[in-house]
A protein has these predicted regions:
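Glycine-rich phosphate-binding loops of nucleotide-dependent enzymes
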Residues: 1-268
Length: 268
């Protein structure tokens, strides 16, 4: 079953086609990567899915429901969360407070409850804090809840951003270059973490990533974009051997060196 399905999605900026007739299907509880050179349209596609951009043509479906043109908050309410290439934490808030921000769509206490601070509001706040600390433990950040996010190491800030995305209880999680700026050890930890999101929480993952080691190591299916067009789609093994992909993105040397990487990462 497809969690996400796009049909001939086209997005233009002036006279430039940032996306042209993109068909993409993301299967339930899969890890699906989107790769391509800078400017290929990867983040533009994410922005169309999440409602930040409205495509000029085509449709996007989430669990069979047409979400084309819905506002970002409506898409979030329907169970889509996202992280960004550049970390967007609230630097002067604690780790727990950052996660509470991500829970906002699901909190029932409104403005009046917040002002009166009645019993129901207090109970909901207590439950929310407990859930935030549970998410921190799941993300390997136990004991860090009361630290300012700006004081966490870079890799932990990445995981905190993921924890905040999980606070929305998503069934589709969009990750935009989750290993950007990480050292090899942090990258390996993030790869295992992404697998856990799928295996333990049943979350479907749509991933943008430039590190081919990561893409080949965790993806079940890979879609390749170039100049806003889909030029290939297939398994890691198929993508490595695709001449158009090699020419447009990987380069002959990169492609020839990926087989051993894929094997070692798949068994890690």
């Amino acid at each position: 079953m497809a969690v996400l399905f796009s049909k001939k999605v086209t997005k233009r900026f002036g006279g430039l086609n940032a996306l042209s007739n993109i068909d993409l299907e993301v299967k339930e509880q899969s890890i699906h990567s989107v790769i391509g050179p800078n400017g290929a349209g990867k983040t533009t596609f994410f922005n169309c899915v999440t409602g930040f951009y409205i495509p000029e043509e085509g449709e996007i479906f989430l669990d069979g429901r047409n979400i084309t043109g819905l506002s970002p908050d409506r898409v979030t309410h329907l169970g889509v969360s996202r992280t960004y290439q550049n970390i967007r934490l609230f630097k002067n808030m604690t780790a727990v407070e950052n996660i509470l921000v991500g829970m906002h769509p699901h909190l029932k206490s409104g403005l009046v409850g917040g002002i009166l601070h009645d019993r129901r509001t207090m109970r909901e706040e207590s439950d929310a804090v407990a859930e935030a600390r549970r998410l921190l433990r799941f993300c390997g950040l136990q004991g860090k809840g009361d630290l300012m996010s700006k004081n966490l190491p870079y890799g932990e800030q990445r995981r905190l951003e993921a924890a905040r995305a999980l606070a929305n209880k998503p069934h589709l999680l969009l990750l935009d270059e989750p290993t950007a700026g990480m050292n090899p050890s942090e990258t390996h930890e993030m790869m295992n973490f992404i697998r856990r999101l799928r295996d333990e929480l049943g979350i479907t993952i749509l991933l943008i990533e430039h590190q081919m080691r990561v893409v080949m190591g965790i993806s079940e299916l890979i879609t390749v974009l170039d100049f806003g067009e889909k030029i290939a789609e297939g398994t890691p093994a198929q993508i490595q051997k695709n001449p158009r992909v090699i020419e447009a993105y990987l380069g002959q040397g990169a492609a020839s060196g990926l087989s051993s990487t894929m094997t070692s990462d798949a068994t890690a």
